[in-house]
Structure formats: structure tokens, C-alpha cells
């Protein structure tokens, strides 16, 4: 039996100067049977934004058939970053991570695809770019473990939490 779901898709255009504009469009999607479609949270970190790699990263995301359901260019507050990285609060790198992610603009996204969490993690590559496979985001755009270009949820539950924090209507 088919069900109709109302979904939101963010239409965007990336100008040569890196400006991102948005419009929202609603559409009906017919789901047939059991679906593996899921959503995940993605972030282009300040190092990749500052290096003008955002457009390249977004192009690769689209080439791998992700639907960009929501996107925003923003600068995270210290409070947002602390909440986002709360799981690492007791780790020695926590303060450096918070300082880094608040050091400049980021691009946050809600991505949708079959098995989106795993697909995005595979496309990102290993946290340490030295260990990342050729063709992955981190092999292409990261410089070290901290400045590793992109973030992605590590599980469906984490994706839901991260999407709720930044895109509550899309979680």
C-alpha cells in the first residue's frame, strides 16, 4: 500500500562568491513498501569553508545521489558547539574542538538517501585523513584529525539528535 508523505526540499544556488540562497518547496512522495530511506546530519567545517571547498563538497554530495533536504550557512555559537559535542566533554580534545568549530562559518545539512548514515560516513572517509581512502572527502579536503573538513552522524540515533538540534522540522 502506498502512503503519501509531505516532505520539504531546500532548493539552493551557490554563487561564485560562495553565497548560498534558499527557497522551500513542498512535494508529495509516494513510498512503496519497505524503504531504507533515511536522513543524516552533515557539516562542512570551518577549515573547508575557509579554503573555498564548500561548492566542491556539495557537488560531490549531489554526484553521490544524496538529496539535500535542508542546508544553512551559519556560525555556531559556543553554546551550540558545546551542546553538539557534549559526547566528547570529558575528552582531552573537547575545548580545541569547540574552539575550532566556532572559529568561522560552517555549512550544516540534512541529507537524505537510502542508508544515508552509512553512505555519508563512507563518503567522508576515516577521521584521520592520512588513513582515509582515495576519493573520500577527508582525503581530498582535510589537513589533519581536527581540521578534517566534514562531520557526519555516526548512527541513526545520533543523526536524529543532531538533526533535532539544527533542523527540528526535518528530524
Language-model-detected regions and their locations in the chain:
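Non-catalytic terminal and connector segments of soluble metabolic enzymes
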Residues: 2-171
Amino acid at each position: 500500500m502506498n502512503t503519501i508523505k509531505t516532505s520539504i526540499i531546500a532548493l539552493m544556488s551557490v554563487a561564485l562568491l560562495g553565497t548560498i540562497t534558499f527557497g522551500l518547496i513542498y512535494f508529495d512522495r509516494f513510498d512503496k513498501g519497505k524503504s531504507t530511506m533515511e536522513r543524516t546530519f552533515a557539516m562542512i567545517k570551518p577549515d573547508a569553508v575557509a579554503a573555498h571547498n564548500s561548492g566542491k563538497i556539495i557537488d560531490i554530495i549531489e554526484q553521490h545521489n544524496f538529496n539535500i533536504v535542508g542546508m544553512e550557512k551559519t556560525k555556531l555559537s559556543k553554546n551550540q558547539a558545546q551542546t553538539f559535542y557534549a559526547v566528547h566533554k570529558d575528552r582531552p580534545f573537547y575545548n580545541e574542538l569547540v574552539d575550532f568549530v566556532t572559529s568561522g562559518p560552517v555549512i550544516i545539512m540534512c541529507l537524505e538517501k537510502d542508508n544515508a548514515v552509512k553512505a555519508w560516513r563512507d563518503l567522508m572517509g576515516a577521521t584521520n585523513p592520512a588513513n582515509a581512502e582515495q576519493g573520500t572527502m577527508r582525503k581530498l579536503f582535510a589537513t589533519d584529525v581536527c581540521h578534517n573538513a566534514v562531520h557526519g552522524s555516526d548512527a541513526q540515533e545520533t543523526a536524529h539528535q543532531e538533526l533535532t538540534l539544527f533542523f527540528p522540522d526535518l528530524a
